[in-house]
Amino acid sequence: LRLLLKLLLLLLGQQKHWPERQQQQQPQPWLDRQQQQQQHNQQLQKQQWPEGQRQQLWPEQQQQQWPEQHQQAQQQQQWPQQQPQMQQEQWPQQQPQVQQQQQWPQQQHRRQHGQQQQCMNSQQQLQQCGQQQQQQLQQQWSEQQQQQQQQQWPEQPEQQQQQQWPEQQQQQWSDQNQQQQAQQWQAQQQQQWPQQQQQPQQQQQQQQQQDLGPDGVGIVVPYLGSSPADFEVQNLGVSVLPRIKLPLPKFDNDD
């Protein structure tokens, strides 16, 4: 048993170290190929471009390639400096447009304000003209009336006024009397109107009381039907039309 265990341990230890040994023993062809390719490329370069030719050709190529690269670098460096110059060159052309855009609402507002002021001024002028015309017309009218009155009323107007005054006074007095009478009549009507309305009601009630009679002299037959038919008076046997006053028969003591 002990031997078997030792053998198993040895086998396991060999299996653990086996891949490392295998890698060490196995060759690596791809590394060799890379090294060989690099060496081959170096040899080709040496053959095609010897050291003297490379030294001779390099300054010319460098001179040709350098200005192009230098120009590009200068352009990149100078571009932010040139940009404001271009903006400054174009700015005077763009500036009037901007000023026009900025000034346009102000000018429009000024125009509108000027038009409003003109309208207000024109309205004020019209009002002033109308007032002046009214004043002129009133003055002319008053002057004409004064002239006509002076023509109609000569130097002695008081006498004519005294002559005409009684007639005018009588007419005015009669007019005032008529107005007062009309007002009094209206007031009387307003006062008498409820009394006149009450009078027919009182008369109707009195007529009904008279028809019935306190002593039983007469009787009223009410209208009960929908058509004017004859009705009999209660306990009398007499056929009468509605609302006709009938005398009651007189009964003797013997009957």
Curated annotation (Swiss-Prot):
Sequence repeats lie at residues 18-48, 49-57, 58-65, 66-78, 79-90, 91-103, 104-140, 141-152, 153-164, 165-172, 173-192, 193-210. Keywords: Disulfide bond, Repeat, Sporozoite, Sporulation. Residues 149-210 have a biased composition (Low complexity). Signal peptide: none annotated. Residues 18-90, 149-224 are annotated as: Disordered. Residues 18-210 are annotated as: 12 X approximate tandem repeats, Gln-rich. One of its GO terms (biological process) is sporulation resulting in formation of a cellular spore. It comes from the Eukaryota. May be covalently linked by disulfide bonds to other polypeptides to form the 80 kDa antigen. Unknown. The Gln-rich tandem repeats may be important for an unknown aspect of the parasitic life cycle. May be an important immunogen. This is Antigen LPMC-61. It comes from Eimeria tenella (Coccidian parasite).
